[in-house]
């Protein structure tokens, strides 16, 4: 039996489908997902401030070049190369849109660490 979690999405772009998106699809593999006005976890983005009305774990996502404000969110997924321990995951928008098979690594709790194996130089 899967653990039940209550979630909601606010402040995303116009047309965002909160019941059918990559986040929910990943979560449904491990959890029984329930949408609630009183969620345990709120996912929010850069298109509003409604997330401030919630008293729960706040998870920020943006595909824009905006650094997450960890004074406002508990966890974040964004574009920038920053190190904030287990509270931050770099997820560029192109990964979300075009490389969905890589989600298996998120579901498996493992994210491959890329190693520098070659050198590339560009001369003009």
Give a label for each model feature.
Residues 38-124:
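Catalytic core of nucleotide-activated saccharide and alditol-phosphate transferases
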Residues 1-54, 69:
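N-terminal pre-catalytic "stem/leader" segment of glycosyltransferase-like enzymes
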């Amino acid at each position: 039996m899967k653990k039940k979690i209550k979630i909601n999405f606010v402040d995303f772009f116009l047309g965002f489908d909160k019941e059918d998106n990559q986040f929910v699809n990943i979560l449904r593999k491990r959890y029984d997902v329930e949408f609630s006005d009183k969620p345990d976890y709120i996912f929010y983005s850069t298109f509003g401030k409604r997330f401030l009305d919630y008293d729960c774990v706040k998870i920020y996502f943006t595909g824009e070049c905006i650094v997450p404000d960890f004074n406002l969110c508990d966890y974040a997924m964004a574009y920038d190369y920053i190190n904030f321990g287990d509270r931050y995951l770099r997820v560029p928008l192109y990964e979300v849109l075009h490389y969905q098979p890589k989600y298996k690594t998120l579901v498996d709790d493992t994210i491959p660490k890329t190693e520098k194996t070659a050198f590339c130089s560009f001369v003009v």
